[in-house]
Amino acid sequence: MILQTRNLTLQYPGKILCRNLSLTVNPGECWAILGQNGCGKTTLIHTMGGLHHANGGSESSVLVAGKAPQIWSRRELARHLGIMLQEEPGEFWGNVCEYVLLGRYPHVKSMFGWEIVDQNIAMQAIERMELTSLAHRPLATLSGGERQRARIALLLTQSPQCYLLDEPLQHLDLRHQLLAMTLFSELARQGSALLMVLHDVGWASRFCDHVLMLFDNGRTIAGTAEEMLNRPNLEALYQCNMKEFVVGRARHFVPETMPGV
C-alpha cells in the first residue's frame, strides 16, 4: 500500500464533494478518477497529495506509505508522491532542460547541485516525451501541449512511487495523448502507482485497471475498470445517454443524447 484514504470526507460550504471515501492504492495500479466538472476531483488530488487537509473531521485521513502527508519532510514526500496540478503557478525563467531537472531535487546528494547522473535522467525523460529539439528553448516560449509534455518529463525525472495527475492529457494532441498514456501504463507495470483525472472514458477503459467515480452528491464508487465502466454507471455519472461499442478487446463509450435536450 502506497496511498490510502480512511473515511475521507471533503466539503465546502453548501456542498459535500465526497463522503467517507476509503480507498487503498497499491504499487502497480493505474487508477482513473472520473466525474463531472466541479465534483471534487481536483480537491481530492490535492488532499491526497498533502496540499489540503481533510476537512471531514477527526475520522477522515490520508496516509502516504503509512503516514499522514504532513508528517513527511517535503523531500521525503516528493520521493513518495509526484503531483501534476491542472495549472502551474508562476512562470519558470529557464529552459526546458533546467525545468525538467527540478524533478531531481528529492534525490540530490551533493551540496553543489546536479550531478551527471541527474542530467542524464533528465535528458532521458526529455527524449521520452519527444522534446529533445526543444531542450534548450526557454520554457515560456513553448506551446501549451509542449509545456504539458515538459511537465510530464519533470515527473519522470522525479521518479516517485505514486503519481497524482490532474488532467495530464490537457493540451495534448492525439499522438501525445497516446504517448503519455502508454508511458503511464509502463510505469504501472514497473511498479509505480498512478491516479489520474481523465475526461475521456476511452483512455480509462484502455489503460487503467481501476476506476474511482465521484458523483455530484458526494457519493463515490470504486473498483476494477471492468466492474466500473458500463453504461448504467457512466450515464448516472455524466447525466447523459451513452453508446457503447467494442473494437477488439477495447470498450469505448461516447455520449449520445442528453435527457430533455
Specify the residue positions occupied by each region the protein language model found.
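ABC ATPase nucleotide-binding domains
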Residues: 231, 235-261
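Helix-to-loop junction immediately C-terminal to a conserved catalytic motif
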Residues: 49
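The feature captures the beta-strand-to-loop junction immediately N-terminal to the Walker
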Residues: 34-36
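Conserved ABC ATPase signature
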Residues: 112-113, 138-142
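ABC ATPase NBD Q-loop/coupling interface
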Residues: 61-76
